[in-house]
Structures are given as C-alpha cells and as structure tokens.
Amino acid sequence: MEKQELSTLNHCVFSLQYHLVLVTKYRKQVISEPILKRLLEILRETLEKWDCRLIEGNGEADHVHLLFAGNPNLQLSVLANNLKTVSSRLIRKEFKKEISKTYWKPVFWHRSYFIMSCGGAPLSVIKKYIEDQGSKG
C-alpha cells in the first residue's frame, strides 16, 4: 500500500489529488506524439505556477489525462480554464502548420472538461467512519 503524502499550509494539513481530462475541440485527433510531449511540459509548468504538482500525465490523439496534487486554495474551474488557455495558445503557436490542417480558427480544446478528486479511502469507508463517530465500543 502506498503511503499518502501530506502537505501543509499555515493552518491546515491536506492531501488533495485530482484527475483532470481535457478533450480537443470536436474530439479531433490532433495530438501527435510531439504535441503530447510538449503539451505535458506546458501543463506541468502551468500547474507549478499554481503551486500544484503533476503526478502523472498522458493522453491519446483527442484528449489528455492529468493526475495532479493541489492545495485547498485552488479554484479548480479557474485552474482548468487557465491550463486550457495557456496550452492552447502555445501549442497553436509552436505547431501552427500541423494544427491548422484541422482547425482554421484559434481553437484547440473543447470548452468542457472533466475533473474528479481522487486518492484516500473509498467513500463507503469514510461514510462508515463518520457514522461511527461518538459511538463507544
């Protein structure tokens, strides 16, 4: 079993991990290996600017998965949109010839995203633990 890493701020101890999925506009298959490699570099750097840490990242031709550790001060919707904006702008600039074959407008990501908290005990275990608080024996 993997030991859970705890982080601290002035008034709290926490362990927050998130799974984020970003999908290309119209699910077009535009993410080649070189684009994926560069995307992961951009996303890692952007996460670090938000005081987050990329644990794992990978993807396929039409989407990327990011597993990252965050902190309690994160506004997840703002972070997700910043990740999409920064990476879209840089990828479209650096891979203009390749991207323009698929997208004629300045787009790359779908406007939606998927994010889920993960790690720690299953919900059923936490629920049982809370239910049992205050009971003796």
Model regions and ranges:
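Basic nucleic-acid-binding interfaces
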Residues: 1-137
